Amino acid sequence: ENVALTIGSQSAFFFLFNMLGGEHEDGTHQKILLPITPEYIGYSDVGLTTNLFYSYQPVIEKLDNHFFKYHIDFDKLTVRENTAAMCVSRPTNPTGNVLTDEEMLKLLAIAEQHDIPLIIDNAYGEPFPGIIFTETKPFWNNNTIFCMSLSKIGMPGTRTGIVIANDLIINSIRNMNAVINLATANFGPM
């Protein structure tokens, strides 16, 4: 009920962003909020409409030995009236920054408060063991959409995306899959 497979996580984001954001029948233009930048550049290619995203710059914490960590600037983060969903990658691509559990809990609370989904791109992260080296706790509730990818865990030929979400989102993805790609790829000889 809560899992759908796609032909890679990129197609999952194509489905999700265009299903939730963009032009709607009532004439509104819904947007996807990226709470922190830099963020995965590949998101910019999946929208069927222009101006699909808006985002915020991070707060930068300087660490020892010329290292730094950046965090979501919750003081500036605003969910607009036309926000359809929030999306973060954990860890972020391209920098590998891992949002803290505290940041994730705040994002979940904001998503629930505004009754919008929080899309979490876990292509490089939880729940697969040994992929990231920061202690994290996976989260899920009815407002959460997890996207994962088998290609990022050492199986690049599989092109299989995994979406975990509420049954309404999953049924919509299954319906889109039936039209666009009918079935995910099989492993075949490897």
Where in this protein do the model-derived segments appear?
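Conserved core segment of the aminotransferase class I/II
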Residues: T28, L48, W140-M190
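Conserved core of the PLP fold type I
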Residues: E1-H114, I119-W140, I145
